[in-house]
């Protein structure tokens, strides 16, 4: 009997990527092979995104391609919440499941492609850390599912439910397994990382025989004991985040915070129903930087939200200049089916959204460029992601750069025979542009 093969298409954010990794790990554990193309697959699983309309369309297109090339398709992920929409375009998909529905996906696979009856785990070993879709030297660590907030532009809670935190012992054991597998950097993700454990009332758990609370600070403190890079994403500026800044100042975890502020106008934040919108974020940023001077803050913003006036937008620009954030992403507001923001009055015309986006990015580019210029002459530790094919250059990142969303550090004039992805280098910064740094090698710190 030939080994059954399953094709896999993974779309969406890092949280969806982790869902894909878990499904692939289970498939491999049960003896399935992962097909490298549609033709060789007995069926195809498509993990979808449904956050904004462009992502919905990309997901529907991916389902269509899988149906055309293979014909046997199981759909999962955030868009799976809207089965009617999927079946309206692709009525012959085998099964539709929701986000993080690992067991439902496996049951559907079993129904259409039964697992091999005699799987030998010693022949087809699954690594302790599971199947990963990231490079070997970094990995995403998802600590919870869902969200308790009801931001008016977001439909994630309707897709993924309310906050459900993983037991901290499970989180820490996964992190330790990743380190044992050679991972140098862990990126902590969820819908609301700083709310971790709220739903469990900070339940006590155990790791390495020691009691640990299922709580944001306690988890970060324990992760800091691993001796590898720990990077925090999707953090809201709650008061208890202040204590984690102390861990950053002590060098326990990376001095890097990804905080989706989304806007600065109190009126717009109220329309968005953003959590912590009443916090004086500028004062908080100042306090954090006093505690940890090398702190890097990344954020994302939405311009052109319904009801946003020119005055609101100017408040945002002024805030941006004062905040001096290191890394910033910006999006024009896009209506999302099912979001309550669609019902708000005074939608902003597309041409004004675009004009505000361009003004926003122009201001932030100047800030980013000036901050990177100050790095010239500094010595930094960087993690190598890849080597350029045609040039003696290592593409790396410092503590200030998350993969894929931030800039890079290009280490020039290296001997490529001595360096590989996953190496830690000590470099001197020699130049900068709006987003990236350029450096020369001082020494290889670790391999």
From Swiss-Prot:
Superkingdom field: Bacteria
Cofactor (UniProt): [4Fe-4S] cluster
Cysteines engaged in disulfide bonds, as pairs: none
GO cellular component terms given for this protein: cytosol
PROSITE patterns: MTTASE_N, MTTASE_RADICAL, RADICAL_SAM, TRAM
Residue stretches making up the TRAM domain: 373-443
InterPro entries named among the record's database cross-references: Elp3/MiaA/NifB-like_rSAM (IPR006638), Methylthiotransferase (IPR005839), Methylthiotransferase_CS (IPR020612), Methylthiotransferase_N (IPR013848), Methylthiotransferase_N_sf (IPR038135), NA-bd_OB-fold (IPR012340), Ribosomal_uS12_MeSTrfase_RimO (IPR005840), rSAM (IPR007197)
EC number: 2.8.4.4
Record localization: Cytoplasm
CDD domains on file: Radical_SAM (cd01335)
The reaction(s) this protein catalyses: L-aspartate(89)-[ribosomal protein uS12]-hydrogen + (sulfur carrier)-SH + AH2 + 2 S-adenosyl-L-methionine = 3-methylsulfanyl-L-aspartate(89)-[ribosomal protein uS12]-hydrogen + (sulfur carrier)-H + 5'-deoxyadenosine + L-methionine + A + S-adenosyl-L-homocysteine + 2 H(+)
Domain MTTase N-terminal per the UniProt entry, residue ranges: 4-114
Record note on cofactor: Binds 2 [4Fe-4S] clusters. One cluster is coordinated with 3 cysteines and an exchangeable S-adenosyl-L-methionine.
Residues noted as binding [4Fe-4S] cluster 2 in the record, renumbered to the chain: 147, 151, 154
Domain Radical SAM core: 133-370
Residues holding [4Fe-4S] cluster 1: 13, 49, 78
Example GO biological process: tRNA modification
Molecular functions (GO terms): 4 iron, 4 sulfur cluster binding; aspartic acid methylthiotransferase activity; metal ion binding; protein methylthiotransferase activity
Keywords: 4Fe-4S, Cytoplasm, Iron, Iron-sulfur, Metal-binding, S-adenosyl-L-methionine, Transferase
Coarse class of the protein's main subcellular location: cytoplasm
Function: Catalyzes the methylthiolation of an aspartic acid residue of ribosomal protein uS12.
Family designation: Belongs to the methylthiotransferase family. RimO subfamily.
Record-given protein name: Ribosomal protein uS12 methylthiotransferase RimO
Source organism: Acinetobacter baumannii (strain AYE)
The organism's taxonomic lineage, starting at the top: Bacteria, Pseudomonadati, Pseudomonadota, Gammaproteobacteria, Moraxellales
